[in-house]
Amino acid sequence: MLGFLFKKVFGSKNDRYIKRLRPIVAAINALEPQMQSLRDEDFPVRIAEYRQQVEEGRKLDDMLPEVFALVREAGKRVFNMRHFDVQLVGGMALHHGKIAEMKTGEGKTLVATLPVVLNALTGKGVHVVTVNDYLAKRDAAWMGQLYNFLGLSVGVIVHGLDDEQRKAAYGADITYGTNNEFGFDYLRDNMKFYAEQLVQRGHNFAIVDEVDSILIDEARTPLIISGASEESTGLYRHMDEIVRKLTRDTHFTVDEKARTAMLTDEGVAFCETLVGIDNLYDPGNITTQHHLMQALKAHNLFRRDVDYIVKEGQVVIVDEFTGRLMPGRRFSDGLHQALEAKEAVKIEAENQTLASITFQNYFRMYAKLAGMTGTADTEAVEFHQIYSLEVVSIPTNKPMQRKDFADAIYRTKREKYDAIAQAIAELHKAGQPVLVGTISIETSELLSTMLKKTGVPHSVLNAKHHEKEAEIVALAGQRGHVTIATNMAGRGTDIVLGEGVRELGGLHILGTERHESRRIDNQLRGRSGRQGDPGSSRFYLSLEDDLMRLFGSERISGLMEKLGMEEGEPIEARMVSRAIENAQKRVEGHNFEIRKTLLDYDNVMNQQREVIYTLRRDAMSAPDLGPTMEEFLDDVLEDVYAPAEGGEAPSADTVAAVWGRLADVCNITRVMQPAPALPTRDEARAAVLSILHELREDTGESYRDIIRYFMLEELDRCWKEHLRNMDHLRDGIGLRGYGQRDPKLEYKREGFAMFQEMLFRIKEGVFRSLTRLRVQRVEEEAFRHKEQPAAVAYSGGEAEAGPAQPHREDPKVGRNDLCPCGSGRKYKKCCGA
């Protein structure tokens, strides 16, 4: 009650924030005549002056009115588009590191130019993050005209660029790209061997377009760079054959709500007989059990044309939120291979993680982060808790005129689809354009078939027909046009109403099913009613829809029976709509917990990742690695000598053991013969340093490259192994809950112990390698490439194989081709030697 009164008297927090910005908007408007008097050639000069002022210490906030006024005038001259006052407010919210919630058609792309130009003045780069390559290229080319007019450079990061092109794009004042490309470039940079090979130059300021899609919808899927593991793919086919013989409810049960499939006791016994083992849960059969469960999930929880499609002999994931294909992405943990076996296509080898990061932790690296979307308010709590981002609702330039009708709920899907087809036919006959939103490819193709039978012309936009996405969406507002689109395909493209459509009521949105997230439903509705245009929306539901079936449809079903509903007759009741909304809230809460749990676990990995990546950067950029090597040596010797330094004289066995470790780790017998007495720690230290000094003398200027090569090689090998061990720990840690232990705390504790052990193994490994080197030939070029450590050879033992490389789409290099490293020599005499 008090909160309500406070809000009534003082306005909401959002209102108060916008009110504070009004004087700044007035100041920008007051500068308009001054900016109008500038010649075109004066604009880059002004920007150069502002850059100089920033270098001299002037704050961006103080320059905001002038810069915003300059950008507004540039927009008028380049695009004949003047930023509205509400767009200036949106630009300020972004500059302040907030999420600007702006309705569809309010010009988010143009709004972003204001804070982008202001923050580009620092010279540290601004990243504009979009959901797909098409939007990145479109916005970079479109808004690039304005930036170039102002004398600022623009780069764009899309799939398929080489490192040189990426480095040039990141070197620009403003860089457009997708969240995946930015994240993967960060991971790839931390697998490079030389500082000059790095493409990114830090994380200063990012504006994330469709921020809800990127920071929430995609946050459940971490970015992973992986290399092929050694496991055979034959087991997947065998397990697939077994699962096909199982009967639901007899051999296994499925919980669709929790998305789990479990074998019954009868099923376990049946599988043991088919596989030919005594105990499926014996530790020796853990691989068989794992593959069997993945095959069970593939057959019962993942549906073709809903969760994935089969295209050109490959299983391609369908994004559950946008309905777009995600080529190159694969389900982890053997699930993708299980789907390949199910669909009888070629099974690719299972991958091993080489580097990974979640979007949450990647975007939290930016010094300042901001976002734009049409729908963020329902997720405001999550944005605040995880990213410390505040959502600001920006007023529309013109009042919203869209009418949102109550949901029409039917008993069965058949009744619902019949009603939808009839409604579309009636609207089409009247000439009113319709955008039909579906959750799956399956539904969109079913409706398309029904409309063909009734003779209603229409366009279909889903993951199978996405080539003309922007063109199809742009035409969706034309008179009599019917467009069927999965989810939010086509976001980012405005639907402009055709001639005479306003008089017919504008664009009608027809939702065929409620999504588990209210925000996705709101996004669909938001395609209509842009810039004060008329419009309408209605969702058609049935008790057989997944959301209704899994979350409380019994109450609604009982209510419909009491009301005496006839077949084909819908119910429109606020009570039912509220029940559906509550179901959505429960699902949203569940998904938030999943994302939060993922973040809790990744935070443990994130701290470790930061340590490893800092070590790598230091190794790449340090002019002299001598002090680091001496520090490593002191740590190694402290551990080696620990058994012999307990106070009492060490036994003969202890002395022998210490000598053995000195020989193994430091190759000390190269300069010192074992004796009944141990050398002092200082003597051992001097002996090892003498070996390194000899190496320095023999290799000259290449010494630093040799040290760096082996340090990075060992670091990468141990980190890759550690990631695999952490994956295994994570897989089994949930069982600790049965022993009254907190799985997260256990993961943190054990993960830290494993990390400490790994750091020590790195130090040991570096000395084990370096003290065994003998010089054969020294060519500096040999150390410029991780693949060719040809300048040195081991005097004892064998070199371990380098880490598996991530799958790349690069063409294979022939033995007689020029080497891609740029040396000018043939591949067979250079990196292919």
Swiss-Prot record:
<dbReference type="InterPro" id="IPR004027">
    <property type="entry name" value="SEC_C_motif"/>
</dbReference>
<keyword id="KW-0067">ATP-binding</keyword>
<keyword id="KW-0479">Metal-binding</keyword>
<keyword id="KW-0547">Nucleotide-binding</keyword>
<keyword id="KW-0963">Cytoplasm</keyword>
<protein>
    <recommendedName>
        <fullName>Protein translocase subunit SecA</fullName>
        <ecNumber>7.4.2.8</ecNumber>
    </recommendedName>
</protein>
<dbReference type="GO" id="GO:0046872">
    <property type="term" value="F:metal ion binding"/>
</dbReference>
<dbReference type="Pfam" id="PF07517">
    <property type="entry name" value="SecA_DEAD"/>
</dbReference>
<feature type="binding site">
    <location>
        <position position="494"/>
    </location>
    <ligand>
        <name>ATP</name>
    </ligand>
</feature>
<dbReference type="GO" id="GO:0043952">
    <property type="term" value="P:protein transport by the Sec complex"/>
</dbReference>
<dbReference type="InterPro" id="IPR036670">
    <property type="entry name" value="SecA_X-link_sf"/>
</dbReference>
<feature type="binding site">
    <location>
        <position position="821"/>
    </location>
    <ligand>
        <name>Zn(2+)</name>
    </ligand>
</feature>
<keyword id="KW-0653">Protein transport</keyword>
<feature type="binding site">
    <location>
        <position position="830"/>
    </location>
    <ligand>
        <name>Zn(2+)</name>
    </ligand>
</feature>
<dbReference type="InterPro" id="IPR027417">
    <property type="entry name" value="P-loop_NTPase"/>
</dbReference>
<dbReference type="InterPro" id="IPR001650">
    <property type="entry name" value="Helicase_C-like"/>
</dbReference>
<dbReference type="Pfam" id="PF02810">
    <property type="entry name" value="SEC-C"/>
</dbReference>
<keyword id="KW-0997">Cell inner membrane</keyword>
<dbReference type="Pfam" id="PF07516">
    <property type="entry name" value="SecA_SW"/>
</dbReference>
<feature type="compositionally biased region" description="Basic and acidic residues">
    <location>
        <begin position="806"/>
        <end position="815"/>
    </location>
</feature>
<keyword id="KW-0811">Translocation</keyword>
<dbReference type="GO" id="GO:0065002">
    <property type="term" value="P:intracellular protein transmembrane transport"/>
</dbReference>
<dbReference type="Pfam" id="PF21090">
    <property type="entry name" value="P-loop_SecA"/>
</dbReference>
<dbReference type="InterPro" id="IPR014001">
    <property type="entry name" value="Helicase_ATP-bd"/>
</dbReference>
<dbReference type="InterPro" id="IPR011130">
    <property type="entry name" value="SecA_preprotein_X-link_dom"/>
</dbReference>
<dbReference type="InterPro" id="IPR036266">
    <property type="entry name" value="SecA_Wing/Scaffold_sf"/>
</dbReference>
<keyword id="KW-0813">Transport</keyword>
<dbReference type="GO" id="GO:0017038">
    <property type="term" value="P:protein import"/>
</dbReference>
<keyword id="KW-1278">Translocase</keyword>
<comment type="similarity">
    <text>Belongs to the SecA family.</text>
</comment>
<feature type="binding site">
    <location>
        <position position="831"/>
    </location>
    <ligand>
        <name>Zn(2+)</name>
    </ligand>
</feature>
<feature type="binding site">
    <location>
        <position position="87"/>
    </location>
    <ligand>
        <name>ATP</name>
    </ligand>
</feature>
<dbReference type="GO" id="GO:0008564">
    <property type="term" value="F:protein-exporting ATPase activity"/>
</dbReference>
<dbReference type="InterPro" id="IPR020937">
    <property type="entry name" value="SecA_CS"/>
</dbReference>
<feature type="binding site">
    <location>
        <position position="819"/>
    </location>
    <ligand>
        <name>Zn(2+)</name>
    </ligand>
</feature>
<dbReference type="InterPro" id="IPR044722">
    <property type="entry name" value="SecA_SF2_C"/>
</dbReference>
<dbReference type="GO" id="GO:0005524">
    <property type="term" value="F:ATP binding"/>
</dbReference>
<feature type="binding site">
    <location>
        <begin position="105"/>
        <end position="109"/>
    </location>
    <ligand>
        <name>ATP</name>
    </ligand>
</feature>
<keyword id="KW-0862">Zinc</keyword>
<dbReference type="Pfam" id="PF01043">
    <property type="entry name" value="SecA_PP_bind"/>
</dbReference>
<dbReference type="GO" id="GO:0005829">
    <property type="term" value="C:cytosol"/>
</dbReference>
<dbReference type="InterPro" id="IPR000185">
    <property type="entry name" value="SecA"/>
</dbReference>
